[in-house]
């Protein structure tokens, strides 16, 4: 139900953004409000998503840096560090969500003249990244890295692609 409400909020914000130039401030409020709601939902969720238990079990049982499994090295390293420092899966979800939404919001603000509409498109394709997986983080970094192509900073773009 809440996904429908978020969709309606984004849809209304998109109409304001495109068709009512006097309400640009309202559209910005809707953009940041929706982004904040999606961010909160993405790391406060518990036992949601088809592969939640697999990720949770991996996090709970990581005691050394073993790069021989099917996860990316950066993801393994991040899991290990968060497990070692905080031993809290919620902290891991918070950090993953922060990475994802930082890069998504920066990319949308840089690339789009209609940020609410862009967030609506992102939400429609990924359910807002609420049930995020590693590929959404990579997608967010890649979307952000498009700015380096525009600015002709090829080495920064390649670095971002490698990180993603």
Regions found by a protein language model. Name each.
Residues 73, 85-102:
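Loop-to-helix entry region of an early transmembrane alpha helix in multi-pass inner-membrane enzymes
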Residues 115-143:
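Membrane-embedded helix bundles of polyisoprenyl
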Residues 28-34, 43-66:
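Extracytoplasmic loop-helix module adjacent to an early transmembrane segment
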Residues 125, 155-164:
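Membrane-interface alpha helices of multi-pass inner-membrane proteins
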